[in-house]
Amino acid sequence: MRPRSLLVLIVVLAVIAPAAYARGKKPAPTAPGTYKEWGQDIDQIEIIKTFRIQDYDKIIVQPFDTTKAPLPDKKEKWYGTMKSALAAYTEWFMEGLQPELKAKADVEQSSSVPKASKTLIIRGVVDSMDPGSRAGRYWGGFGAGAASSKATVEIVDAKSGKVLAIVTQARRAAGTFKGGGGSDLEVMRDSVHAMAKDIAHVLDTFV
């Protein structure tokens, strides 16, 4: 690692580590209400009705609505990359959710809307995605040029159709350990993986 990048990394960690540790120690309430900085890693959650994840044996992930995410001008060189990232969003989300989830529930991706009992539906809207800057990631060191994604995710009881909770979350990925800072597509994928892991943590909290 370059000396300048190492110095930046040390300074950033010294600043954010205590705050991150403190945030991770906060209890995660499951009573109805709207909470910011909930649990260890959630920006905002609105709990409409509490539930127990062990009461469900199946989780259906529906395709994310990507039509709300702003697109760059078609002349921009990363227009195609953004379109590809949005098209792959649900697939990437599944890749991140399944391995992280501790609950004993089968996870499937489907566009249908089941009315089955003991089934949760995960659906959401991609609010924004940004590839960041590969040059920034390569030359700027830790955190610079990071890609990002933001989504609003609903957790729904399939049988009743009622929304149980709404999570608003943004994630960044800096491609720190990728050669050349990682391609734009790679780091956007990483940000979606991180988002999906966050949703797994939310589900596992409701016990």
Where are these regions (language model features)?
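Short alpha-helical segments and helix-capping/turn motifs at coil-helix boundaries
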Residues: 7, 44-46, 108
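Short connector loops/turns at beta-strand edges and beta->alpha or beta->beta junctions
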Residues: 65-70, 129-131, 170-174
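Short secondary-structure boundary motifs at beta->alpha junctions and helix caps
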Residues: 76-83, 144-147, 156-205
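A structural "domain/chain start" motif
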Residues: 21-95, 114, 201-207
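Sec-exported extracytoplasmic/periplasmic mature domains
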Residues: 94-106, 131, 172, 200-207
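Surface-exposed short loop/turn segments
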Residues: 23-36, 103-104, 109-162, 174-182
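N-terminal export/membrane-targeting signals
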Residues: 1-22
